[in-house]
Each structure stands twice: as structure tokens, then as C-alpha cells.
Amino acid sequence: MRRPALAASRSAAAALLSVLLSAGLATYARPAEGQRVDLVNRTSLRVCADPANMPFSNDKGEGFENKIAEIVAAELKVPVEYTWFPQATGFIRQTLAAKRCDVVMGYAQGDELVLNTNPYYRSTYALVYRPGAGLDGVDHLADARLSGKRIGVVAGTPPATVMAGLGLIQQAKPYPLLVDRRYDSPGERMIGDIRSGDIDAGVLWGPMAGYFAASGGDKLKVVPLTKEAAGARLAYRITFGVRHLEDDWKRQLNALIARRQGDIDAVLLAFGVPLLDEQSNLITQPRR
């Protein structure tokens, strides 16, 4: 999945990357208007995905985007076929734009590198901390109890901007944004550092926070950040990404999302993804 930091930071100033993709993507050019050639394969669901990017995807089919791809393929009555490529610089250029696949299963709404479908979920960054360590009840970054605390944050993401505005960056521990997840997992390391006490808390994209906080070790508190009064936006709508001008394919996927929203929600909730409605209320049961 392409995390939402890129779309947010790009409008800010210097094209800071979302969870996964980066500057090399800017080389992808849209087809000229009128060049409406539908290149979608109708005999399989061709998906572009990262082979080592849990909880989103891996080459064993264990991620929630893998599971959602299976729902889509079942609805279309075709098998899933993957093109594997690390979600870093050049991902879209090397996969979707190169016509090696027809859909990216997780893409922040509003990014111009793809044509977005309707969103199939909305989530937010989350604060993670150990219960009983002095932060119980903290539910926003402006809480005075976070002052002076060592907080982990992925560099270049929207919460880093919010933390800077609140004076929380000087003591923060940064984690890298662009990595090859086959060899490094900053989100997983952040959660491990919270458990060990190396940091007091961490701020991480909600789907990663929910998954890694539940993956072994002591129970951690995961608080979706929905109450920030100022600073960068922390909640994002996530869509499927398809090639520009493939409007029929987009409409087909939109209809499929509407039909199978409850099944998609069930997958996301099982992975601990904090789901938000448009009023930023938590969704705790699949929508039907």
C-alpha cells in the first residue's frame, strides 16, 4: 500500500513520501486526453504489490490487501496474478504504468499518479503506548503529558509535522520512511522499542499500528488520532489505484466495492485496522 504521507507532504512543500513510494514516481506521465485505450486483462486480476510489506501484502498472500484482492477476484470470477515489486522509488512507473498489472490495492485518495476508485476504507495515524506507563487516557498529541516524552515517528510523515508544531520533535526518535521491507521494518522496530521502553510512545499509520501492536509481546494501547485541532491532516481515504483514463475499469471496481464493503470491512477489522467513518467515528462492525 502507498501510505498517505506523500499526498499530504507534496501539497506542503517538498514531496515527502507516503508510506511507500517516492520521487521516482514523478516520472510517470499520464496518457494524452483522447488516448483512451483499455489495457485491463479480463482473464485474471493482475495486482501490483510489495512482496514483503505486512500487514498490507506479502508473496505468501498473508496481508489484508492480499485478502481483499481475493474478494475482488472472486467477484470477477478470475484468478489473482501478482507482479511483485518493492514499494519504493519507481513503484508505479515499473508496474502499473508499465502495464505489468491493472490495479494497486491500496492508494491514498487524491494522488495524481493513479486514477483512484471510490475509497474502501478511511483510517488515521495512531498513538501507541504501554498501559500503566503514565500515558493512560492520552488521545491527542497536544496532551501536556506527552511533553518531554521520547516519541517514535516516521520521518517525513504528517504526524512529524504536527509534533514539530507542538514542540515534540526535539526528543523524538525518527524512523526511516523509505526502506526495502524485505530487509527492514521501521514500524515493527518502533513497536519493539515501545515494548522495551526505549521510547515512551510512537505514532504510526493506523493499519500498521494496529497490526504490529497485536503481534506478540505485552498488550499495547493503540489510540487513533482523531482529535488533533491543528497541523497536518492525519486521516486518509484509501482506494484502489488504476491507470488514468481506464474509467470503465474504475466504475467496475466502484460497483464491486459497494457490493462487498461488508466483506472488505471484516478483513480490515480482523487485521486491527482502525476504521473511521466520514465523521471520524470508529467503525467496529462490518458495514452492510
Where do the protein language model's features map onto the residues?
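Extracytoplasmic small-molecule ligand-binding "clamshell" domains
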Residues: 33-112, 181-184, 270-274
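Extended ligand-binding regions for polar small-molecule ligands
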Residues: 63-75, 132-135, 139-158, 231-275
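Ligand-binding clefts/hinges and TM-proximal coupling segments of bilobed small-molecule sensing domains
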Residues: 37, 79, 158-179, 254-288
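Periplasmic-binding protein-like
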Residues: 50-51, 122-134, 214-257, 274-288
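Bilobed "Venus flytrap"/periplasmic-binding protein-like clamshell domains
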Residues: 46, 51-55, 59-74, 127-186, ...
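Alpha-to-beta junction loops
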Residues: 78-79, 97-106, 149-150, 189-190, ...
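Bacterial N-terminal signal peptides
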Residues: 12-24
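Acidic, polar ligand-binding/catalytic clefts
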Residues: 70, 74, 79-145, 156, ...
